[in-house]
Regions:
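Charged/polar interaction segments and conserved charged motifs
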Residues: 1-31, 81-83, 94, 106-108, ...
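Charged, low-complexity, helix/coiled-coil-prone segments
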Residues: 54-70, 115-130
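Sequence-level detector for tyrosine residue identity
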Residues: 75-79, 85, 110, 123, ...
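Amphipathic beta-strand/beta-sheet edge segments enriched in Tyr/Trp
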Residues: 67-106, 229-232
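Elongated alpha-helical scaffolds
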Residues: 47-62, 71-84
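N-terminal segment of the mature soluble domain
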Residues: 1-55, 162-232
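Low-complexity, intrinsically disordered or weakly predicted helical/coil tracts enriched
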Residues: 56, 64-73, 86, 91, ...
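C-terminal/domain-edge helix-coil "capping" segments
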Residues: 87-163, 171, 175-185, 191
């Protein structure tokens, strides 16, 4: 997102992360003692710390026109993961997926500036992360889990792509990730279970790459092999 390039002068980080940071400092978590003083300082993390990160995994914008009314409809979708992991060895403990959608209407065709202005306004004024602590409190976050569940494989038949826009066939991994994220978010919400994130070609020892707003370093977050594997 171009919005992560827009730096807030007070915090020194992008505007989306700034909103998240302000929310994190006001969170009321039932079973987690959140250190709100050192949220961005890795050097202050004790060796046995469980770290929490909110990750923007994917975002997209789609548009269609109603030829009868000449009105353009737009949808901005953002897909996130709330990750809990052992900071000492960067191994995943739990993941909670969530997403949201912004719907737009316009008499003019959307361009990049219009979309960015609407998305920026949404992040700044509509408080998309306001219920983040309520979502986390639905789960019993533990350092270890006896059993884990996750999507390990997604198969899309060629005839399905024939019904999609041509460019989708060139982005099969993106489509698979969207399907996995959408399914995992609903599964997680309905059953209050944390999910092992989907990674294309999931295998034992697989890792998810993370880059934090306060560092240029890229971390490999080790993922557990799900005991209960979902094949879509």
């Amino acid at each position: 997102s171009d919005l992560v390039k827009e730096i807030n002068s007070e915090t020194g980080i992008d505007i989306i992360s700034t909103i998240l940071l302000k929310k994190a400092k006001k969170m009321h978590l039932d079973s987690i003692d959140l250190d709100t003083e050192n949220l961005l300082d890795f050097s202050k993390f004790p060796d046995n710390a469980i770290a929490m990160s909110v990750v923007l995994e994917h975002e997209e914008f789609t548009e269609e026109i109603n030829w009868a009314t000449k009105v353009h409809s737009g949808w901005y979708d953002a897909y996130f993961q709330i990750l809990f992991y052992d900071f000492s060895d960067q191994s995943l403990i739990a993941s909670i997926p969530f997403d949201f959608e912004i719907r737009m209407l316009s008499e003019e065709k959307y361009n990049k500036k219009i979309v960015l202005d609407k998305v920026r306004d949404f992040y700044l004024h509509d408080s998309p992360f306001d219920k983040l602590d309520n979502k986390i409190n639905q789960f019993n976050i533990k350092r270890k889990y006896d059993r884990r569940i996750g999507i390990t494989q997604i198969d899309i038949q060629d005839r399905a792509f024939e019904k999609m826009p041509v460019e989708y066939k060139k982005k099969q991994n993106v489509i698979k990730n969207l399907i996995a994220q959408s399914f995992a978010e609903r599964l997680s919400s309905v059953h209050n279970v944390a999910i092992v994130p989907y990674v294309e070609g999931q295998a034992i020892g697989k890792a998810m790459k993370l880059r934090f707003v306060q560092s240029d370093d890229i971390y490999d977050l080790k993922l557990a092999n799900p005991d209960y594997q979902i094949h879509i």
